[in-house]
């Protein structure tokens, strides 16, 4: 059980989870732009662009952010 907890705490993989109009982004590098219909951020050498409607920031931590809103497009750009 302790091993599972340590693995969870030490997990550095990027994750993007979208469910029920909630977008949970874990282990991002840097937030670039935050608008009500557009969010962009860096993950290592990639840029993630999220377009949507009524995108509202619900939680902001050093390595995680939670958005609420309808996603209309998601784009990954090599930078």
Predicted regions and their residues:
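N-terminal intrinsically disordered, cationic/polar leader segments
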Residues: 2-79
């Amino acid at each position: 059980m302790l091993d599972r907890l340590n693995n969870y705490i030490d997990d550095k993989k990027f994750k993007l989870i979208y469910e029920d109009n909630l977008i949970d982004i874990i282990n991002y590098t840097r937030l670039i732009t935050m608008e009500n219909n557009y969010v962009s951020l860096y993950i290592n050498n990639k840029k993630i662009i999220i377009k949507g409607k009524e995108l509202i920031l619900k939680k902001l931590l050093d390595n995680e952010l939670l958005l609420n809103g309808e996603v209309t497009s998601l784009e990954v750009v090599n930078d």
